[in-house]
Amino acid sequence: MNLSEIAYRRVVVKLGTSVLTSGSKQLDKAHMVELARQMAALMRSGVEVVLCTSGAIAAGREHLQYPALPDTMANKQLLAAVGQSQLILAWAQLFSIYGLHVGQLLLTRADLHDRERYLNARDTLNALLANNIIPIINENDAVATNEIKVGDNDNLSARAALLCDADLLILLTDQKGLFDADPRTNPNAKLISQVEKIDDSLRLLAGGSVSGLGTGGMSTKLEAADIARRAGIEVVIASGHHPDVIKKVVAKESIGTHFSAIENPLESRKQWILAGPAAQGSLVLDAGAVKAVTEKGRSLLSKGIIGVKGEFERGATLQLVDQNGKIIARGITRYCGEALGLIAGKHSDEIESVLGYDYGDAIVHRNDMVVL
């Protein structure tokens, strides 16, 4: 691969469970070594690679010889705890064939929620890459009680792409990409090769995972793509079993579904607001506030709030929703939930008289907000 012909310098590759198991109940080591070969070739060409890998629970089942366990959170975490060591060992052995070392990062939502921990994770990623070591990222399923759920590693890979300032995110799955209908049930379904905008009509095309081993579906890949492209990162969803898929995607061959990055990506802090903290509550906005926030780029004022949901403190990340429940923005609140319950719908000049203090007119300042 000719370095001068490669458009990307830092790539995140996400491998779903269905890709790693090839549809079986165990890791497909032969296919994993083929994927490792492609990533190693990129590294030799000067392209830095970050691997976000699923498969810990599948590896745990295999290592324990498929125990008959009740489908509980504790048992999923048991399998993840056993399987994670087997998974990282497998990758370390496979990459060693090509003279490469790996470093493991197990993350939870808490690592992304806290700004300092978020930046520390970024520094670790950059240090590994600077020393020609492949970072291997997975959700810390053994301790993350609300993280073993649909979409977790798809979204995690997008956040990893933001963390390391990647310019390409490759989501490899058991499908060839995004189709205009479900290809599993509709033989006339056509592959969508290019996406410039992710909207509600596109989200309706997404389906769920059918492997039974993974936690992601096409809808979560759209969520991940939307996060990444807002940060200026291109995204490709493609089949992990297409020959030389990683090499071909990086070479910009027409394969899978390509999502263009937005022209004016979010700056670093707004990337964190979008992808870091979990929303701790929501504010329901009237039509005027929705227009002011989404069309005029203004801060959210108390007058435009008609509902407060959740218990949260000042500085929490919130979702801003319209009266139909559609999320229109995310942002950091300057007032706690209890205070907002008292001043919602009131004019800004009434805040101090109602609360006895005033943190400013803006409930969510436009500089602390990401419009979706």
Swiss-Prot record:
User: Could you tell me the superkingdom of the organism this chain comes from?
Assistant: Bacteria
Q: What does this protein do?
A: Catalyzes the transfer of a phosphate group to glutamate to form L-glutamate 5-phosphate.
Q: Corresponding gene? A: proB
Lineage summary: Bacteria, Pseudomonadati, Pseudomonadota, Gammaproteobacteria, Alteromonadales
Where does the protein principally reside?
cytoplasm
Q: Does the keyword Kinase apply?
A: yes
Name by which UniProt lists this protein: Glutamate 5-kinase
List ligand-binding residues for ATP.
K14, T173, D174, T215, G216, G217, M218, S219, T220, K221
Fetch the PROSITE patterns from UniProt.
Answer: GLUTAMATE_5_KINASE, PUA
Q: Could you cite one Gene Ontology molecular function of this protein?
A: RNA binding
Choose one Gene Ontology CC annotation of this protein and give it. Answer: cytosol
Entry's family note: Belongs to the glutamate 5-kinase family.
